[in-house]
């Protein structure tokens, strides 16, 4: 038999039956739990899809499935059986679940995916099954039992109300009135519930009291029915003394009862208004997340809570309370509070303490208790009056009962006494009302004055922070006085009026408010959270660090208060945009200054190239047969300084020249450090100090030097390139100086250096040209130049005396730059100082350490740099002895030259160092450019405020 024929031969059996043919199925609480909780949870699980339908053996190509599995089962079959009441008890349904899981384990291997999914479902099934009610009860049985009990009680009550027994009841009622007030729970309630409008009503209510005392086993419903069915025989069997009693009750009770009713309605309406407001607050949308379980009565059938009414005898919910409030069934606020607290107590009684509903009930009860505590209490005098009226009512009821047994004379005397007492009570009540009106007007005036003061001067409270404790103490005293004067009624009313009068916000205003709040700094957000928590009771206990605010749930008064505070904060920050404009203008000035420097450097470079072509001569170089000189450690800075000395006359207006040169000359620093931050005065300054040490060089970069070194880096690179090009050409005799620019004085030692520098600086020419043609390194910091200065000056230890130093100082006085550039540089330096100073110190110390190690390893290089440095600072106008000394030193240096191979190795090393340094600078520049895109506005605003304070 072929494979297709086998596949066609696989036929699925019919699904299991789900309709009980015997009709013996029942609906129990456990089966309801299995259907609504267990099956629903399993069906929603992500692993339940293979078990939701019967196994399709033909589709899955499982020919032996139904031969191995004799009783197939799936979730859909169980669901249909539960819906059609197939099961007689819950154990049958649990057996079907276990059959489904055992079929999976029987047919599949232990490691298969379907087995893992079945194990996960079985675990969930066992967890849900552990929550099932232990006792199985039929769901419809209780209702039938209740109906049977009610029918039996109705029949028994009807049998008791026969004409023969009704007469006995009438005689009993005639004997009881003397002791009746002791039987009633409160004469006030009886007086209110039973107005003496007709004879039958009074008699019926008296029968209620008698019935409750005589028969405690029967429920109140049956007694009420019996009393309602009994009036006709009662009317027939009235005795002769009954009308006398009713007349006395009529003549005495109406006045006192009416007076008490008027008083009670005034007080009740005042308090019940607040109670209705509390009920509206509890039913509001903002309390929905934790108040929704209490909106409606507990649905016992839907939730499967079949023992609920056994534990909770008096169920209560907010819907029932609202219905009673609408029907005006509450007489005072205490009854309303009792029902609300009963609702919460039922929740705490039935549910475990760690249940979610208990937490929600506690949150809602906090809201209720907080609002209920704000309800104004009744005054003490009025309470006493109420007690007096109740006592008088009790006395009246007792006296009326005694008068019913006595004659007409005693009843008339008691009536006169009652009238006198009632008159006194009315006088007392009038006096109390007058006192209350006077007391209520005084705090209202104080509150109006406070509101006017707060509206007139709201800013003084923010400025005078030290006065807050005094004001708080005064406010506390005023509050205590107000409490003693009983002003509690008016304050919550005023708050409610403010909340009602607050104009609600539309969508655009809420959106603008949220945007304005996002603009505020972090220190202002704490005040916003405080405002919201003080005005919103639902958010009072929330964490201020992780609070979530929904504008839709906030009150209109809270939103308006937030709007006022945000506008006040934004007015204070109105000067910030002006400061930002100033910063932008400075940045533009700085960029323009850089562009101008680059343009001038290009002009200087072109001029140097022209002069070099003019000064070319066919003279032979006398030093050509000698081996090339090894480049000493500081050749780049010396060449740069020399070229800049010759070019500084044409660029005398570069930024910050005067201030930097003067500061460097006064501090006695080296000439190379002054050259890096000077223009035209540095070519003739005698800036050689008696002793040069590497430690002193650590103090060289001052405030102005640091700034000007950064600004003059393009000048260094272009000048180095220009000097290299000039030195590669043929030179004349060593004593002859090259042709100079007009107005420029070049010292003799520089001329000698240029004559011998053609061989020394030849390897660096190509590198410097690449630097010139590449992008100008504008962001080069002061550290690199300081390191070169240290390398140049550290080895020098001999004293050099200069003749005519005063004349050279006068000749080298700095030319003052324009005030605009100077002021902008100083302002820029204040911004860059804090960021650069730490970096400069750390790198300088590291370079000093490296230089000392290098000088210790190569003593020859340090001696050569020392000699060259000593001979390089003698001016042209100095004596012939100094010139001769410099020429002698040059000749001695030429005699002590190393071999060409050593020179090439050293030059390669310096090239590698220079390239590494340039690479690090480029990486630093790119990192700063990347970081420049992210701007911390809070930090920028703080920097601007600090800058403005220092600038003023």
UniProtKB/Swiss-Prot annotation:
Start-end of Basic and acidic residues biased regions: 141-150, 850-867, 911-930
Domain called NET: residue spans: 495-577
Modification Phosphoserine occurs at: 186
Domain Bromo, chain residue ranges per copy: 26-132, 266-375
Coiled-coil ranges (or none): 417-442, 837-936
UniProt-recorded name of the protein: Bromodomain testis-specific protein
InterPro entries for this protein: BRD4_CDT (IPR031354), Bromo_Brdt_I (IPR043508), Bromo_Brdt_II (IPR043509), Bromo_chromatin_reader (IPR050935), Bromodomain (IPR001487), Bromodomain-like_sf (IPR036427), Bromodomain_CS (IPR018359), NET_dom (IPR027353)
Site (Histone H4K5ac binding): residue numbering on this chain: 108, 113
Record region (Disordered): 141-168, 209-257, 392-420, 442-504, 607-746, 850-930
Residues annotated as transmembrane: none
Polar residues biased stretches: 151-167, 718-729, 874-883
UniProt PTM: Ubiquitinated in a SPOP-dependent manner, leading to proteasomal degradation.
């Amino acid at each position: 038999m072929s494979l297709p024929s086998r596949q066609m031969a696989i036929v699925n059996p019919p699904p299991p039956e789900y309709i009980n043919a015997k009709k013996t199925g029942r609906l129990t609480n456990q089966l309801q739990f299995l259907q609504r909780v267990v099956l629903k949870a399993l069906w929603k699980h992500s692993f339940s899809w293979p078990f939701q339908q019967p196994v399709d053996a033909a589709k899955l190509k499982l020919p032996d499935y139904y031969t191995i599995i004799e009783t197939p089962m799936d979730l859909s079959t169980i669901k249909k059986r539960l819906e059609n009441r197939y099961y007689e008890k819950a154990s049958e349904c649990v057996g079907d679940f276990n059959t489904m899981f055992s079929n999976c384990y029987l047919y599949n291997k232990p490691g298969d995916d379907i087995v893992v999914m079945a194990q996960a479902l079985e675990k969930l099934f066992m967890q849900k099954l552990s929550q099932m009610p232990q006792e199985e009860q039929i769901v419809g049985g209780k209702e039938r039992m209740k109906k049977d009990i009610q029918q039996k009680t109705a029949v028994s009550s009807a049998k008791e109300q026969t004409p023969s027994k009704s007469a006995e009841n009438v005689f009993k009622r005639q004997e009881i009135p003397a002791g009746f007030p002791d039987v009633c729970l409160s004469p006030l309630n009886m007086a209110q519930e039973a107005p003496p409008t007709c004879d039958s009503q009074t008699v019926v209510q008296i029968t209620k009291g008698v019935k409750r005392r005589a028969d405690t086993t029967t429920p109140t419903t049956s007694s009420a029915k019996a009393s309602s069915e009994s009036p006709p025989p009662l009317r027939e069997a009235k005795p002769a003394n009954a009308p006398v009693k009713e007349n006395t009750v009529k003549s005495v009770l109406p006045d006192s009862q009416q007076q008490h009713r008027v008083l009670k309605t005034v007080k009740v309406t005042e308090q019940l208004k607040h109670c209705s407001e509390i009920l509206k607050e509890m039913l509001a949308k903002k309390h929905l997340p934790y108040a929704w379980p209490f909106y409606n009565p507990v649905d016992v059938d839907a939730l499967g809570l079949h023992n609920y009414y056994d534990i909770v005898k008096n169920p209560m919910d907010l819907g029932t309370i609202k219905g009673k409030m609408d029907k005006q069934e509450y007489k005072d606020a205490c009854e309303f509070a009792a029902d609300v607290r009963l609702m919460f107590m039922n929740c705490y009684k039935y549910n475990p303490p760690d249940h979610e509903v208990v937490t929600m009930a506690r949150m809602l009860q906090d809201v209720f208790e907080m609002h209920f505590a704000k309800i104004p209490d009744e005054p003490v005098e009025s309470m006493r009056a109420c007690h007096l009226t109740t006592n008088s009512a009790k006395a009246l009821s007792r006296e009326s009962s005694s008068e019913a047994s006595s004659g007409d004379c005693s009843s008339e005397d008691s009536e006169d006494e009652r009238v006198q007492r009632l008159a006194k009570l009315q006088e007392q009540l009038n006096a109390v009302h007058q006192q209350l009106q006077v007391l209520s007007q005084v705090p209202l005036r104080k509150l109006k004055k406070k509101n006017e003061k707060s509206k007139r001067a709201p800013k003084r409270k923010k400025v005078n922070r030290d006065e807050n404790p005094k004001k708080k103490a005064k406010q506390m005293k005023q509050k205590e006085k107000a409490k003693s004067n009983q002003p509690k009624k008016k304050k919550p009313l005023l708050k409610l009026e403010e909340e009602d009068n607050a104009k609600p916000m539309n969508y655009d205003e809420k959106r603008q408010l949220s945007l304005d709040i996002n603009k505020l700094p972090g220190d202002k957000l704490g005040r916003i959270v405080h405002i919201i928590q003080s005005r919103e009771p639902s958010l009072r206990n929330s964490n201020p660090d992780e609070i979530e605010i929904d504008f839709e749930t906030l009150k209109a008064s809270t939103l308006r208060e937030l709007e006022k505070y945000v506008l006040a904060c934004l007015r204070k920050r109105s000067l910030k945009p002006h400061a930002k404009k100033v910063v932008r203008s400075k940045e533009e000035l700085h960029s323009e200054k850089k562009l101008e420097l680059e343009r001038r450097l290009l002009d200087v470079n072109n001029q140097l190239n022209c002069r070099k072509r003019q000064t070319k001569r066919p003279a032979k170089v006398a030093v050509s047969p000698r081996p090339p000189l090894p480049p000493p450690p500081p050749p780049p800075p010396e060449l740069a300084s020399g070229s800049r000395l010759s070019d500084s006359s044409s660029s005398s207006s570069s930024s910050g020249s005067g201030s930097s040169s003067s500061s460097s000359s006064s501090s006695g620093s080296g000439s190379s450090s002054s050259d890096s931050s000077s223009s035209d005065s540095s070519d003739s300054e005698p800036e050689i100090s008696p002793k040069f040490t590497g430690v002193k060089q650590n103090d060289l970069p001052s405030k102005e030097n640091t700034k000007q070194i950064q600004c003059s880096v393009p000048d260094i690179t272009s000048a180095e390139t220009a000097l290299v090009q000039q030195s590669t050409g043929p030179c004349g005799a060593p004593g002859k100086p090259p042709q100079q620019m007009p107005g420029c004085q070049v010292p003799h030692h520089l001329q000698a250096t240029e004559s011998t520098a053609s061989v020394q600086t030849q390897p660096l020419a190509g590198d410097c040209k690449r630097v010139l043609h590449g992008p100008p390194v504008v962001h080069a910091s002061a550290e690199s130049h300081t390191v070169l200065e240290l390398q140049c000056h550290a080895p020098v230890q001999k004293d050099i005396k200069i003749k005519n130093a005063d004349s050279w100082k006068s000749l080298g006085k700095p030319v003052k730059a324009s005030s605009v550039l100077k002021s902008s540089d100083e302002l820029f330096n204040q911004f860059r100082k804090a960021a650069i100073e730490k970096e400069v110190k750390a790198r300088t110390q590291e370079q000093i350490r490296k230089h000392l190690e290098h000088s210790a390893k190569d003593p020859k290089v340090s001696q050569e740099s020392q000699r060259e440095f000593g001979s390089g600072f003698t001016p042209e106008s100095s004596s012939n002895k100094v010139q001769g000394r410099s020429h002698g030193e040059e000749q001695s240096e030429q005699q002590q030259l190393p071999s060409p191979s050593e020179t090439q190795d050293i030059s390669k090393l310096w090239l590698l160092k220079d390239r590494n340094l340039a690479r690090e600078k480029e990486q630093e520049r790119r990192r700063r450019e990347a970081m420049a895109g992210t701007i911390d506005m809070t930090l920028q605003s703080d920097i601007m405020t600090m800058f403005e304070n220092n600038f003023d």
